[in-house]
Amino acid sequence: MLSYRHSFHAGNHADVLKHTVQSLIIEALKEKDKPFLYLDTHAGAGRYQLSGEHAERTGEYLEGIARIWQQDDLPAELEPYIGVVNHFNRNGQLRYYPGSPLIARQLLREQDSLQLTELHPSDFPLLRSEFQKDNRARVDKADGYQQLKAKLPPASRRGLVLIDPPYEIKTDYQAVVTGINEGYKRFATGTYALWYPVVLRAQIKRMIKELEATGIRKILQIELAVRPDSDQRGMTASGMIVINPPWKLEAQMNNVLPWLHKTLVPAGTGHATVSWIVPE
């Protein structure tokens, strides 16, 4: 079942949170000269046209990236991420949104590498064309969860693994935990960043319980809600679960998350939290 297209949702509040966390982790990994791997299990198309039919139909980016990218009081923690957004929108008009692979491409160094996976028959060719001239990148049409077995550990023993499936089938909530556990067995020192949507809170609670049961330590949870939890249809919040986070990440997110919540949610509904699921 491959009906999900991220082009309908690109640049929304969930992308803002996900890509803020992603960019801060990458910047932390760059503090050492040694190369690292960026592995993206569900990479999508790479870039998204915000004036395109899909993005215009939902308008989700108007309540996401459009609310923050030109703010005068932008916190320092957002500079790497917004710098990439600006790179793709140099005329001051918000026309394109870079997905996680393009954010990684802009922030990674020459010595680093990218392993990108996408299974959707429409998105894969778009992703491949974005990276055909980048010799740091390998783009595969494959099952992202299988890559956690096949591509880990990297030779450098350093890396960020981003896992953000569409959750269009309920088994994704279990598959992400199984995938992380398989990856962790092979690469216990890597940083794993798992994105999740809050549609039904009970699903997230179950997923976190299963993650705790793996015995993995150092699990940080970052969540941004735009509305209170609800049993109605639709995403009320999203979060990032980070295993082996860089030591600065907790403080960085505690600093920037209140600003993001205030700017993205003028009505003040929902919440913004940073907490440990499992400490060291």
Predicted regions and their residues:
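Class I S-adenosyl-L-methionine-dependent methyltransferase catalytic core
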Residues: 1-280
